[in-house]
A protein has these predicted regions:
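Glycine-/small-residue-enriched capping loops at alpha/beta junctions
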Residues: 1-106
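Phosphate/ribose-phosphate-bearing ligand recognition and processing surfaces
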Residues: 80-158
Length: 158
């Protein structure tokens, strides 16, 4: 199935699911996370995340998308960059893979990802991009799913 890179605001992408770069407590973050919460409806999304409670690093959980065009939000818990010596690459690939697996479980035909960990988490964009491309490409070769990698602005392009 297709793997497409697009430049857009992820909150406006008409995919079955979008992915939120989350922290372990599933609390609203800054940047992309804040934009997703605001567009979905902060009160509803906060309540849904509080009901789940937490998620492990490199994993993802699902909530409704509320006010977004998507059906679901997959909250992927992403690693912060600590020099690459603490398993960050494996954790980041795991976050992508876990969200992709949720898409399959929820019978999604499409899912949209931001470039996870590349903003406030400080992951080098080129490395984050390579992990995203490798993980998504491997997955779509074996699964019937359209995946969008949504890059918000030219500065996000590695």
């Amino acid at each position: 199935m297709p793997f497409l890179m697009i430049r857009n605001d992820i909150t406006k992408v008409a995919a079955d699911a979008i992915v939120n770069p989350a922290n372990r407590n599933l609390l609203q973050g800054s940047g992309t996370s804040r934009a997703i919460y605001q567009a979905a409806g902060e009160q509803e999304l906060t309540a849904a995340c509080e009901a789940i409670g937490h998620c492990d690093l490199g994993r993802a959980v699902c909530t409704p998308a509320f006010g977004l065009p998507a059906k679901y939000i997959f909250h992927a818990v992403c690693p912060a960059w600590h020099g690459g010596f603490f398993g960050e690459a494996k954790q980041l690939a795991g976050a992508y893979h876990s969200a992709l697996e949720l898409a399959a479980e929820d019978h999604c035909e499409s899912v949209a990802f931001p470039l996870l960990s590349s903003g406030n988490y400080g992951y080098p964009k080129e490395q984050a991009f390579r992990i995203a491309v490798d993980t998504i490409t491997q997955y779509v070769m074996e699964h019937d799913l359209t995946v969008y990698l949504v890059l918000y602005d030219r500065a996000r392009w590695p």
